[in-house]
Amino acid sequence: MNFTAIDFETANCARASVCAVGLVRVENGKTVAEYNTLINPETYFDWRCVNVHGITPEDVESAPTFPKVWKEIKPFLSDNVVAHNAPFDMSCLRAALAEFRPPDASEFDYICTLAISRRLFGMGGNRLNELAEKFGLNSFRHHDAFEDAAVCAEIFKIFETRTDVSAFKKRFIPPF
């Protein structure tokens, strides 16, 4: 299956406060495109979020805002999108889109690797870093948006060999 793995980090608990995004495009089992950027959320940073991902207000001062980033990431979101804990990432995307309402936002299918993991392995040990360790992919910086997306892509490729991942598809519908 061709897909794009995506991960967002947020500045605070508001889903629209995206401050980083990482994407990895996989076609025929090979990475064909990548995108990684900090995003200026134009809002405050909660210290708890900074403690998780390490991104500070100073880091994003000269970063593009989400409307500029949207133009870059939109081509990645054409068919199957994969994320670990996809409800979080899809809610970030939905909230960010709701703020500026781009005319080119469209529907796409998405799949959650956390949901697949819970089905395959039960309820314990399903965090991204735990799965990475389980599959020997443990040399990554957890909560770095790009590295999380890259590891998610590798985990999804493993899951494709173990189950019918298409059974986990859901539909992303823009908020307007």
Where would I find each of the regions flagged by the language model?
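Acidic two-metal-ion nuclease catalytic site recognized across multiple nuclease folds
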Residues: 153-176
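Buried hydrophobic packing segments
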Residues: 93, 116, 152-156
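Short, glycine/acidic-enriched loop or turn micro-motifs at the edges of active sites
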Residues: 10-12, 115, 151
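Conserved beta-strand -> loop -> alpha-helix junction used to position metal-binding or nucleic-acid-contacting
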Residues: 104-117
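Short, conserved phosphate/pyrophosphate- and ester-handling motifs at nucleotide-, phospho-/glycolipid
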Residues: 148
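Short Asp/Glu-rich motifs
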Residues: 69, 151-152
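Generic structural signal of hydrophobic/aromatic residues within well-ordered alpha-helices
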Residues: 49, 73, 116, 165-169
